[in-house]
Each structure stands twice: as C-alpha cells, then as structure tokens.
Curated annotation (Swiss-Prot):
Record keywords, A-Z: ATP-binding, Chaperone, Cytoplasm, Nucleotide-binding, Stress response
Family per similarity comment: Belongs to the heat shock protein 90 family.
Listed SMART domains: HATPase_c
UniProt keyword Methyltransferase, yes or no: no
Annotated segments matching region B: 343-558
Gene3D superfamilies linked: 3.30.230.80, 3.40.50.11260, Heat shock protein 90, C-terminal domain (1.20.120.790), Histidine kinase-like ATPase, C-terminal domain (3.30.565.10)
Domain of life: Bacteria
Protein name in the entry: Chaperone protein HtpG
Gene Ontology CC annotation, any one: cytoplasm
Subcellular location: Cytoplasm
Residue segments, region C: 559-636
Length: 636
C-alpha cells in the first residue's frame, strides 16, 4: 500500500499540541512511557505464543533496545514484541477512543494554573504522545507478529501524519525520536548521551521484567581502539517479589507510574504476600487522584495478573470488585495455569480466595489511614468515596468494614464530615433512629422544608448528596441497631412524652378544624398525590411533599428511568403546616365560599411550591408560572 497522509482525530490533535508545547516540567518521563509500551508489547507476544500454538515466533530473547546517535541527534526505543498492524497504528496513535478525553481537554483549556494542568495530563496518561515533548519529529516502524509486511508512521506533531508500508521491518516496534536541542531552561536534557539515558532508565524503569539494552562505547586499554559493548541497563527485579524493607519509596512510586500510566505519586502502597494453600504476591496502590473514566462503564480496571512473573492480563476484573476499580497494581499468583481465560478466572477458587484477601487488606489500609493519617484519608474519600459506597449495596461480607470507613456530611459541623459511630455517640436521649436527608447538594438539603423540625429540635441529620446514597441507605437499613431513617419519609414525631401530652389537645383541634380542607385537597390534587395531611415536621414552610417509609424516592425514579428501567410513578403525600398563613388562609377562603377555580389554583401553587422547595421538578412549569404571574399581578 502506498504512502498516505492522514489527519489526527480532533481530540488526538489537541492532546498532541499539549505535548508539543508542553508545560510539563519533568520531560524525562517520555522515555519511561516508551519503555512501558515496549514492555507491554513483549508481554503480549509471550502470552500470544502460549495461547496460539500456530503463531511461529521466537520468544527466547525478548528485550528492549535503546539506540542513540549524538551526531544525528536521534534516540530509538526498539522491541521485538507483538508489533502492530497498519489499522492498529491508525487506531492507537491517530485516534483517542479513551473515555474522558473531551472533559480533559475542556478542563485544560479552562485551567490557567500550570500545576493543575500537569496533574490533569498525568491523570489521563498520554503514553506515546509524550515523545513530542522532546522531539521535533517521530518515526515509528512496526510489524505485527505473524505478518509479512510492516508499517512506517511519521509525524512532526503538526496535526497530520504519514503512514506507509515497510517491507523490511523486523518483528516488533521501533520508535525513533529526532530530538529537539537541549534546553536547560525548558528542562530539555541531552537525550542523545549515554549518561542521561542510563540515569533515566535506572530511575524510572529499573524494575521492568525484560532486559533494556544499549550499546556502550568502552575506551581501549593502553591507548588502543575503543570497543562497543552491549550492556543491560536495568536490574529486572520484580518489585512485588521483594520484601517491603528492601524497596525504596521512590521505587514504589515509579513502579506505580509504570502500571497506572499516572504521572503523580500514589497516595498509599499495599505490599502483601499470601502463603499456605495458595501462594501469591500483590503490590497494590491507592491513587492520589480519581481517573477521568472512574464512572464510565468502559473504564479500565487497574490490577494486572501475573503467574510466576509471566504476564497474563491487564484489567483483571476477577481480582477486584467494581467498587475498588480505581486500585492499581500487580498480583502474581503461583499456581494458576498460564492459559486461564477471563471466564474461568471468575470461577477459580484460588482467585476467589486471593480476591477476598485483597479486598480485606485494602479496606483495612483505608481504615488505618482514617485513624492515623486523616489528611490522606480525606484525600482518598474525596476522590473515591462515591465509588466505595457502591460496595455497601452488594458486598454483604465486607459491609461492616465499609461502614467503618464511611464518611458523610452532617448538620453537626459544616466543615467536618462525620461517620456513623460518631453520630451515634451524639444521639439525643431516647433517639432510636439515625436521620438522613438526600439531595443534589448541601444547600438544597439544608433549605428543604423536611429539615425544619429537625433543625428546630436540634436533631443531627446526615446530608447525602451522591446518587449512590439513595440506594445504599435503603439496602443497609440500620447501624448498631439504629434504623437509618429519611427525614422525607413517613410520619415524624420528635417530641418528648411531656411535649406530646401538652400538644395533644392542640393537634386534635387542628385535625377537626382542617378536616374539610384536607378532604377537599385530597380530591382536588388526586392526580398528583395520594393523601393530604397535617405535618409535624414543618415550622416555617407552608407545605412539603413526603413519601411512605418504603417508597422509591423521586431521585431514584429518575435514575432508574435514565438506566432504561420501567418504574411506576409513585404518588406522594402532601403535608401542610396548619400554623402557616397561606394554609390557614386557604382554609378560611374555602369556608367563606371563594370561587372553586381560585381555590384550585391556590392548591396547585401550594403543591408546586412544595415540590420546588425540596429541589423537585414540576410536571408543567409553564402552567405553574402562568398562575403565579396572574396572582402576583393582582397584588400590584
């Protein structure tokens, strides 16, 4: 196939420009990214040769070679791995199909802060594109294992690339960088020198499991001619196989960046070994930042599976539950078959045991952070709390551990979240329920009519603002014998026995006085509500809308419908504040024979205001605003 010039996909072109004009201070990491890609290609070739007996490839000497030419100012990273087809080159390099790309680019454009931009780029992981931080032109030559012809790709990072056939390409991939001039002010080192390359490999890629080789010129002895010697630059020691006291923090950090393609250091390291019936080593990391695709169904899981240091697969879902999908790292199991499939992994007894132990260790680590390193814990929960709470829904085995690390906002202290254990210690005498409220944000919840009685009586309420909160509180149900109870469901009675006795006569009078209005409103609003009653939870608002204890909330209804589920609409209950002038005025207007049409309009306004006050949505906003505008006009 002849040479052709193609344009980068729009988002790839924008990300490429960020690299060409990069503000990232540590440009040395381009080599780490290229070596990581080469290492992945070698792992994939070895795995393919094990699974496909018809694939005729030599895996006896899998390695990475680095070649430098100071005169031509080039640096080449070469591997004899799996290689790529022409279509793969276009797909992998010319296009970015990664979830979150558009969001990343939008945020980067809006950010004027260099440090924030660097963190965002690091969270996304740019891999191959990092080469353009240090190179004016990049040439890639590759041939897929088992194919006869290769592909040559070239670009100067200006929005287009050239792709052509390469009949003489060896198996694997070679990336040649035509380097920019060294510039100390821009943190551009001279990457065509042996010493610089050696230092970068030692710092970032020493643990890579394949040899990284480079031809090194050795001076001759006694004035003789110099010779060239091929040296291995890395130690190739699997970090997870070493004991924790043998590993420096910097080594952990660089290994994390290798497996995660993150550019920030991890928040916490979990290094463990399992012995006995099932032997394994695990090196896991809690990231500092949530990835952009954390809530994407296509988002990548973070744990790689090895068997006796042989790479088996990325994103091993069988090793980590969905609510810990952000955990990165490596698990090396000793007794699995090299040919095990993803499907069989789900049922494998050893994997199930390993998974159970990993989850318990991760949760224990977070609990330890919560107790001893509150700043780290706060960072963790801010980034990943909404995901971790998903585990409360289905992981009954670890539910108690999850509740121990749970952190939620509360009316007790606007600045500091609380946990359930601390809430219980602050409960009033005689209080048997843990009260909570759900909504889009703290402000909406605090200003909701449902909160009025709780605020007046001094009862603490948990403020839950994540969509998953609606689900887990229903599923969990109680904590230490205390029922989790929504302030927006069921009847509310916060009075003491003495207060209840003193107020009983007044309540009976109100029930008698408002009986006719309640009956009329129940009939008038029958299409919207199933009952109208007097409220014990309102102190300043005229009305609110509540549900029964086991009703599906409007937020959950909306969520289920967005997911494509058929959910019958639940009619809710309208509660009235008998001491509010609007409610008492409506009662008097009905007794005085005001026109039915005017009374109905007032009833609709009362119900609509109750919906809006809790952050709900009107079924017919234009009808509501028309009635409201007409009423306001009469007052002028």
């Amino acid at each position: 196939m002849s040479s052709e010039t193609l344009e980068f996909q729009a988002e790839a072109r924008q990300l490429l420009q960020l690299m060409v004009h990069s503000i990232y201070s540590n440009k040395d990491v381009f080599l780490r990214e290229l070596i990581s890609n080469a290492s992945d290609a070698l792992d994939k070739l070895r795995l393919a040769s094990l699974r496909d007996k018809d694939l005729d490839v030599d895996t006896a000497d899998l390695h990475i070679a680095i070649e430098i030419d100071p005169d031509a100012r080039t640096l080449t990273v070469r591997d004899n791995g799996i290689g790529m087809s022409r279509d793969e080159v276009v797909q992998v390099i010319g296009t970015i199909a990664k979830s979150g790309t558009a969001e990343l680019l939008r945020t980067l454009r809006e950010s004027a802060d260099a440090e924030t931009s660097q963190e965002l780029i690091g969270q996304f992981g740019v891999g191959f594109y990092a080469a353009f931080m240090v190179a004016d032109r990049v040439v890639l030559v590759t041939r897929e294992a088992g194919a006869t012809d290769g592909t040559r790709w070239e670009s100067s990072g200006e929005g287009t690339y050239t792709i052509a056939s390469a009949t003489d390409a060896p198996q694997g991939t070679a990336v040649t960088l035509h380097l920019k001039p060294a510039d100390s002010e821009d943190n551009l080192h001279d990457y065509a020198t042996e010493w610089t390359v050696r230092q970068i490999v030692k710092r970032y890629s020493d643990f890579i499991a394949h040899p990284i080789r480079m031809a090194v010129e050795q001076p001759g002895t006694d004035g003789g001619e110099s010779t060239t010697e091929v040296q291995t630059l890395n130690s190739m020691k699997a970090l997870w196989a070493r004991s924790r006291d043998e590993v420096e923090p910097a080594e952990y950090h660089e290994f994390y960046k290798h497996v995660s393609h993150d550019w920030a250091d991890p928040l916490e390291v979990v290094h463990m070994r399992g012995e006995g019936t099932f032997e394994y080593e695990a090196l896991l990391f809690l990231p500092t930042h949530a990835p952009l695709d954390l809530f994407s169904p296509q988002g990548r899981r973070g744990v790689q599976l090895y068997v006796k240091r042989v790479f088996i697969m990325d994103d091993c879902e069988a090793l980590m539950p969905g609510y810990l999908r952000f955990v990165k790292g490596v698990v090396d199991a000793h007794d699995l078959s090299l040919n095990i499939s993803r499907e069989l992994l789900q049922q494998d007894r050893q994997i199930q045991v390993v998974r159970r132990r990993l989850v318990k260790k991760i949760l224990a680590t977070v609990k330890e952070l919560k107790a001893n390193q509150p700043e780290k814990y706060r960072t963790f929960w801010t980034e990943f709390g909404a995901v971790v709470k998903e585990g409360l829904i289905d992981d009954t085995e670890n539910r108690d551990s999850l509740l121990e690390i749970l952190s939620v906002a509360s009316t007790h202290d606007p600045a500091e979240p609380t946990d359930l254990a601390d809430y219980v210690t602050r409960m009033k005498d005689g209080q048997t329920d843990i009260y909570y409220a759900t909504g889009e944000n703290r402000s909406t919840i605090e200003n909701s009519p449902h909160m009025e009685a709780f605020r007046a009586k001094g009862f603490e309420v948990l403020l839950l603002t994540d969509p998953v909160d609606e689900v887990w509180v229903e599923r969990v149900g109680e904590y230490e014998g205390k029922t989790l109870r929504s302030v927006a469901k069921g009847q509310v009675d916060l009075d003491t026995e003495e207060e209840r006795s003193a107020a009983e006569a007044e309540r009976e009078r109100q029930r008698t006085e408002y009986a006719d209005l309640l009956t009329w409103l129940s009939s008038t609003l029958a299409d919207q509500v199933r009952e109208v009653r007097l409220s014990a939870r309102l102190t300043t608002s005229p009305a609110c809308v509540v549900g029964d204890a086991h009703d599906v909330t409007p937020t959950l209804e909306k969520m289920y419908r967005a997911m494509g589920h058929e959910v019958p609409q639940v009619k809710r209950i309208l509660e009235l504040n008998p001491t509010h002038p609007l409610v008492s005025g409506l009662r008097k207007a009905r007794e005085q024979g005001v026109t039915e049409e005017s009374l109905k309009e007032t009833a609709e306004l009362l119900y609509g205001m109750a919906l809006l006050a809790e952050g709900g949505e009107l079924a017919d906003p234009s009808h509501f605003t028309r009635i409201l505008a007409e009423r306001l006009a009469r007052t002028l």
